[in-house]
């Protein structure tokens, strides 16, 4: 059984929903990024999404685009992301999901990526721009059930397409709360419930909702209609606004604690 599946089952037993946190690996630099992740873990994060910096992150809003630029400017690369995973795995047991675009993974080599990510301590991957019909060649290189492939479902996805995506997914499904790019505003939890219901009809996998979630109130509302909540741009905004602030570690930890408290039933 995968680490991700174990984690969701343990949370369900405690009547809690998962808090999934995203940060770009290497933002603003390698050392500070490790400390930021440590603060998230100390704050009670359940699942960590580590973004692989990319020069053309088209699905992301300006906040995460700038985080990618800062990470790349500091010398971050996919091999260094995997090095960071090893370090993070040394101080936490929570699932680590690598989050990014296909180009860096393709350049690195699919089989090599799987083997090195697994060896580093990663538990899965979410590739934003790789739909199921284009991913068979990559996933055929992977063996066993210890490395999950998380899939995205949009609010505009039809029932048949949902079923296809869910059939190709493992770990959990990332349900996008609204159309647009990461960091978009205008969250409506009732619309999330409307999309989640048909999705849950075709899969037993946990469904985690992201895009536009930044406050404990958002988390509480979305957690009531899903299995987990993804917060990304809000973490990156906090980092961006406090790049030179020595209290950033404490700020990230306390922010994480406030979000996590809202996931408890």
Curated annotation (Swiss-Prot):
Record keywords: Amino-acid biosynthesis, Aromatic amino acid biosynthesis, Lyase, Tryptophan biosynthesis
Enzyme class: lyase
Reaction(s) catalysed (UniProt annotation): (1S,2R)-1-C-(indol-3-yl)glycerol 3-phosphate + L-serine = D-glyceraldehyde 3-phosphate + L-tryptophan + H2O
Molecular function as annotated in GO: tryptophan synthase activity
Keyword Metal-binding in annotation: no
Active-site annotation: 49 (proton acceptor), 60 (proton acceptor)
Protein origin, superkingdom: Bacteria
Keyword Acyltransferase: no
Record InterPro entries: Aldolase_TIM, RibuloseP-bd_barrel, Trp_synthase_suA
GO CC annotation terms, alphabetical: cytosol
Functional note: The alpha subunit is responsible for the aldol cleavage of indoleglycerol phosphate to indole and glyceraldehyde 3-phosphate.
Binding partners and assembly: Tetramer of two alpha and two beta chains.
UniProt record similarity statement: Belongs to the TrpA family.
UniProt xrefs under HAMAP family: Trp_synth_alpha
Name by which UniProt lists this protein: Tryptophan synthase alpha chain
Organismal lineage: Bacteria, Pseudomonadati, Thermodesulfobacteriota, Desulfobacteria, Desulfobacterales
